Swiss-Prot record:
Keywords: Glycoprotein, Membrane, Transmembrane, Transmembrane helix
Name the record gives this protein: Protein FYV12
GO cellular component terms, A-Z: membrane
Glycosylation sites: N91
Localization in the cell: Membrane
TM annotation in the entry: 109-128
UniProt membrane topology term: Single-pass membrane protein
UniProt organism field: Saccharomyces cerevisiae (strain ATCC 204508 / S288c)
Main location, first listed in the record: membrane
Amino acid sequence: MRLLHHGEYGTKLIGGKCSIDGKLGHPCPLSRRRKKHLREKEMGPQYVRMYGPKRKAIIRTGNPDDGINLPDTGRGTLTAATIWSRAYHSNYSYLVRPKVVTLSKHRELMTTFLLYVLYVCIYISAFIK
């Protein structure tokens, strides 16, 4: 899994699936691209990627358990610019897939389950004696 570093472009997000540089997905219409270029000059590049059916941006601090969900609440309300500025002002440097978060959740569930099984085994063995 490759992380998205500062200064590197991700795919174009909310409100269409075109990309800033035509490599990822189809290129944006020129008018939109021009507007975007002007906006980027004001607030810096937008390097946010969305994944999954609910299109959550996961911002990562370096620890897999620190994934932060910024859900897309309706079209255009949470823009790439908003997510970028939030990430920038919170000093988060990477954006990753939600896979990291789900794996950590599964790990927690597994450890809890195993501890429970161990407890049951000890209880049964004590009861048999």
